[in-house]
Amino acid sequence: MALAYDFSGVYQNLSDEASRALSELGVTSADADALSALSFENVMAALSKMAGNGMTAPLKGLITMTAVLLLCSMLTAYQNSLTESGETVQTVAVLCLSGAVAVPAVGFIGTAGDVIAQCANLFLAYIPIMAVMLAASGRAVSSASYQALTVAAGQGVMRVSSDMILPLLHIFLGIAVSSGIAPQVGLGGFLSLITKLTKWLLGFVMAVFTAVLSLRQAASGALDSLGSRAARFALSSFVPVVGGALSEAYKTVQGSLHVLRSGLGIFVILALAFTFLPVLLQGLGWSLCLFAGKALAEALGVSHCAKLLEALGTVFSTLTAVLLCVPAVMLIAAAAAFAIGGEA
């Protein structure tokens, strides 16, 4: 039975860039007939354009990093005659690198927070649609539990990411720059603490989400005649590791992922892709450029700069993990709804 869903709330919560990209592809609804006209070449062209735009800032940063490191290396070669100013050279280099990378990192953290907030709004806009689909398929119990528990669990992941992990990364960034300027202070312990704390926070909230999802499936499955797959998932979904949590979530809903090829599923994927891919690709670009900059700094023997670039790389890699987990939460929730309600 074909159902008409109200997507006005979803469109209103899409970013301007995502709305423009979807409009250029001709995606204005979740109608299967309209989406069938979507060409692979157009999608790849849009993704290539995103990748190019995302790599512009990281490549500029890499050029600046290379220039600063080469200049610092040349000045360090005269360290015997500039003994008193040897530390000054490295300090100036760290400050230059901070301006080239740390300042964009602050802006990137803010952008990531905005994208997560947009995803949270998209998530809330999708919940009534999913609940209607479940109710229309005759799964009244699943519809009620899906709307209540999935909202709480999914919003919990996004709120922890934006309100706890991102502020911790701001603190980490400040300590990393301070440690690079004054390495004798010994702030490495604080950097290690914040790194572990952010990873465990992210792992914990993802584990809670998969646990709630699995328990909801096990409970509603007893009433809605679901298979035993959700019950098996409930036994192995409490490991506080992001990769493990996502893996277990995938195992639970992998049988229903084929349903995402329906009109509603494709629209979910496209909306998430064009919301997250621009910032995600930029984060990956910064991570790669910082890795290359760190390798160059080590080759040139500029140890202070290498440590700073490594710390900054940790910021971007952590942000990348967050930006992967948040859309995964929404995609998994959608797949779970499809598993119960069937194709819309």
Q: What are the residue ranges of the model-derived segments?
A:
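Gly/Ser-rich, low-complexity
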Residues: M1-Q90, V103-D114, Q118-C119, F123, ...
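Membrane interface segments of multi-pass transport proteins and intramembrane proteases
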Residues: N80-E84, P183-T198, A297-A306
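Small-residue-enriched core segments of transmembrane alpha-helices in multipass membrane transport
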Residues: T88-G99, C119-P128, G156-S162, I194-A207, ...
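Mid-bilayer segments of alpha-helical transmembrane spans in multi-pass integral membrane proteins
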Residues: L95-P104, F123-A140, V160-L168, F172, ...
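Extended, low-complexity, charged alpha-helical tracts
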Residues: L122-Y126, M133, A295-A299, S303, ...
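Loop-centered beta-sheet repeat module
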Residues: T150-A211
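Helical hairpin unit composed of two closely spaced alpha helices linked by a short loop
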Residues: S262-S303
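Interfacial loop-to-transmembrane junctions
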Residues: L300-T320
